[in-house]
Amino acid sequence: MASPPAHRSSKAADEELPKASSTFHPSLWGSFFLTYQPPTAPQRANMEERAEVLRERVRKVLKGSTTDQLPETVNLILTLQRLGLGYYYENEIDKLLHQIYSNSDYNEKDLNLVSQRFYLLRKNGYDVPSDVFLSFKTEEGGFACAAADTRSLLSLYNAAHLRKHGEEVLDEAISSTRLRLQDLLGRLLPESPFAKEVSSSLRTPLFRRVGILEARNYIPIYEKEATRNEAVLELAKLNFNLQQLDFCEELKHCSAWWNEMIAKSKLTFVRDRIVEEYFWMNGACYDPPYSLSRIILTKITGLITIIDDMFDTHGTTEDCMKFAEAFGRWDESAIHLLPEYMKDFYILMLETFQSFEDALGPEKSYRVLYLKQAMERLVELYSKEIKWRDDDYVPTMSEHLQVSAETIATIALTCSAYAGMGDMSITKETFEWALSFPQFNYKNFWFICTALQRCRIDQA
């Protein structure tokens, strides 16, 4: 939650319009996505047909790859994943990864190959020991890498960021290579593809990047590589454009839902950030099968934004407590508990959750029940923070961490993502695990988010 609201109690005369006000700037997007017009059906069909031809052509290349040509095979898999194409070849890639992991017969003196192999395997869940880099250490504490071998230096830097606690060799690799890359960047042509790669890695290491953005940024870099595969390049461009069409359709739907929500509920004080929220959620699940997850995530984030603004900047304490009481009932009959300005929103919220059940169908609609439980927990903790404020209570560090780790809505967003996934491996046990608030998962996530936010504030 943000700063404390201005009022702690409600009066009958002010029931319909609380005194607190907001200062949020309006949306930068206006009706841009509402007026989006997709290509015609024949145009879309032609794009899909060409993409399928290219997918099979690339599949043949992938199936022809072996560990006998390890550098080429590792580079191909890395390229496909960076270009956002890995989803289409999961089975082929998994088979090759197992072979790469099992095959210890490769040039262990090739720093670029060792780094790329390490990065690829660790990124895909294989427990590769970091001592493969020990042989490259120098007596001075750096890493043996020829001045001209800049590619190996960059590969080592990205690989080292997949470190685990206590892996000193990777800690040292990051410190050493960062300094050398920073020095190197000043001597490269700013517009060269490699300079852009170095700059991007120094800003955000490869494995931390949002996949769909990485695909967009890497396409023009890959296009200039002498060893590029033309089928891979064409497919990457076409696939990205097809995904953009889907994203625009989803944003059009979410924008229409949001505009209707705000117009009917008359909650003009809330932040209008539906486009930014979709962009945020898209980063979590951008692959083609997860359209419903993206939509549910975006709508839930929109609802959380409204509730957060009610509790933080607009509603009185009494109003918020009434809302919290009505929230857990999930029934229209509870609107008599609410102040007038909350009633329409409450009904529209119920309709939104019903639309989730309708979209999921009879076999998966049970997932919405768990999503409701996650939202109930979130509102309960928002109320707890308000009580702390009104009572001038200073929580202990332990109490603060426990509550704030949940009020960033990780549980609600996790359940939202799971709810929209068609994969039948998502079961009731999956949701029960998420709702159990696994400490290693959410608390670490909260700590990382908070630390990164503090770093950005310090840098500003």
From Swiss-Prot:
Amino acids binding substrate: 308, 312
Binding site for Mg(2+) 1: 308, 312
One Pfam family linked to the record: Terpene_synth_C
Binding residue positions for Mg(2+) 2: 308, 312
Coiled coil: none
Pathway, per record: Secondary metabolite biosynthesis; terpenoid biosynthesis
Listed name of the protein: Inactive 7-epi-sesquithujene synthase
Annotated organism of origin: Zea mays
